[in-house]
C-alpha cells in the first residue's frame, strides 16, 4: 500500500497543475526511481515498462516487478546513475510551473554510495520539490536519510482486501 499512498500524495501535490489533464503516471513533474537489474539494459524502455507495471499491478511488489521486467538472475538496486538523473531533474524548473515529486520505490535497495548521493539532495532540497521514499525495510535506510524524512508506517494489507481493491481499480 506504500506505493499507492505515495501516488495519492503526489496527486495532491500536483493537483494545482490544472493544465495537465492526463493520467497521473504520465504527469511531467512526477518522477519514479525504482530498482533496476544488471541483466536488463535499455533505460528508456525500462521506465516505460515500469509505468505499465504500475498501471497493471496496483499492489505490485519487488518479486512481481523483477518477474515483470524479465529479470531472472540479478539482484535489483537503485543505482548511483539514477540519483544523478534525479539531481539533474530536481535542479530544473518544473515542467508545468508547480511542484515536482520524486517517488523512490524500493529505497532499501540503494547501496551506501547511492544513499550518500541522495542524502546530498535531501539536505538542501530544491524549492517546490518533494521526495517520497518507500521501503519495506527501514533498517536498510541510512539513519541520516531517515532523520530528514517524515515517517509513516503502514501495516500490510491482507490478501482479500488487496484483491478487492485491485479489482476496483481496473
Question: Which residue stretches match the model-derived regions?
Answer:
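Charged, glycine-rich active-site and insertion segments that engage polyanionic ligands
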Residues: 1-24, 127-130, 135-170
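Clamp-loader machinery-focused feature within the broader ASCE/P-loop NTPase space
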Residues: 1-113
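Conserved adenine-binding aromatic site and its adjacent loop/helix in ATP-hydrolyzing domains
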Residues: 88, 120, 147
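Conserved catalytic/switch belt of AAA+ P-loop NTPases
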Residues: 91, 116-130
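Loop/turn-to-beta-strand initiation segments
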Residues: 96-101, 126-132
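Residues immediately C-terminal
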Residues: 109, 124, 140
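Generic recognition of short, well-ordered alpha-helical segments
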Residues: 113-117, 144
Amino acid at each position: 500500500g506504500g506505493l499507492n499512498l505515495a501516488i495519492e500524495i503526489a496527486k495532491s501535490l500536483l493537483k494545482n497543475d490544472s493544465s495537465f489533464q492526463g493520467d497521473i503516471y504520465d504527469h511531467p513533474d512526477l518522477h519514479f526511481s525504482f530498482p533496476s537489474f544488471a541483466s536488463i539494459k535499455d533505460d528508456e524502455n525500462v521506465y516505460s515498462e515500469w509505468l505499465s507495471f504500475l498501471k497493471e499491478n496496483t499492489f505490485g511488489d519487488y518479486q512481481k516487478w523483477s518477474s515483470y521486467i524479465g529479470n531472472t538472475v540479478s539482484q535489483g538496486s537503485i543505482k548511483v546513475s539514477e540519483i544523478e538523473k534525479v539531481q539533474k531533474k530536481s535542479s530544473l524548473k518544473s515542467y508545468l510551473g508547480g511542484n515536482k515529486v520524486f517517488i523512490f520505490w524500493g529505497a532499501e535497495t540503494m547501496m551506501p554510495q547511492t544513499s550518500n548521493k541522495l542524502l546530498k539532495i535531501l539536505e538542501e532540497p530544491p524549492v517546490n520539490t518533494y521526495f517520497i521514499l518507500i521501503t519495506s525495510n527501514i533498517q536498510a535506510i541510512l539513519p541520516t536519510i531517515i532523520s530528514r524524512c517524515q515517517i509513516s508506517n503502514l501495516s500490510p494489507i491482507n490478501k482479500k482486501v488487496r484483491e478487492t481493491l485491485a479489482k476496483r481499480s481496473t
